[in-house]
Amino acid sequence: MVLFLKSTDMATLPWKTVKAYDEITFKVHEGVARIAFNRPEVRNAFTPKTVDELWEALVTCHESQDIGVVLLTGEGPSPKDGGWAFCSGGDQNVRSTTGYKGENGINRFNILDVQRQIRFMNKVVIAVVPGWAVGGGHSLHVVCDMTLASKEHAVFKQTDADVASFDGGFGSAYLARQVGQKRAREIFFLGASYSAQEAYEMGMVNAVVPHEDLEATAFSWAKESMTKSPTASKMLKFGLNLIDDGLVGQQVYAGEATRLAYGTEEAQEGRDAFLEKRTRDFSRFPKFP
């Protein structure tokens, strides 16, 4: 049973800034990382700079021995109208004919790198959706391992076809795994808005939480997850991914299996025999059926 913190407890947690960024925030407390889009005035739409910062923060989480779970969310509310958002996708103000134009003038589509980083990360990533999850932002919540949504403010909407864009990868195919082919096609082809409860009933949200308790609940889910074996959690994540990820998924899973094998006495015998220039002897090792 997952224990839940009260919202007042969450406010007093001593989050520590890992690194100061311009368009995201990146904090950590007790092994839980909190990464948030920080452009609430535009519903947390992302630019190439946002995505570069997000990717760097996720890589830091991937490599850290001190971080066990990642919470991905959006800062808010908006200073313009008080609205909340997780992420509303790519900022159309910097969209060009060949991608999204960064400050260096180069057109890029680097949000797909972030999707892959979340998908292949060796840790659980939880989307914490306080408001709008739209377009590319909707795809990001889909690719996360779990999603918690604000009962009062979360809205799920896929606007790709409205702006002549499309996510033909995880954002659509993996969504269909979650909600079924017919509902996924409805979400994309009609572009309707869905409440947190509707998203939960479809199967793309794990829990609907009162807004004031959303982040506290996310933190408690993260802490509960961290009580589990990190190796088992990692292998379970990659195993669950494997059926959809083809040879890439197989490579990720097999790589981690090889790492586990390196810790066995059998692997040590193979290494030592090579270094000592002697005949290897695997005869003493069991052959489990």
Model-found features: residue ranges?
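Glycine- (often His-adjacent) and acidic-residue-rich active-site loop
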Residues: V42, G74-Q117, D162-A164
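C-terminal long alpha-helix characteristic of the crotonase
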Residues: P40, D81, A149-A154, V205-V252, ...
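CoA-thioester-processing core
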Residues: V114-F120, V128, V134-F188, M202, ...
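Conserved CoA-thioester-binding segment of acyl-CoA-metabolizing enzymes
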Residues: V2-E75
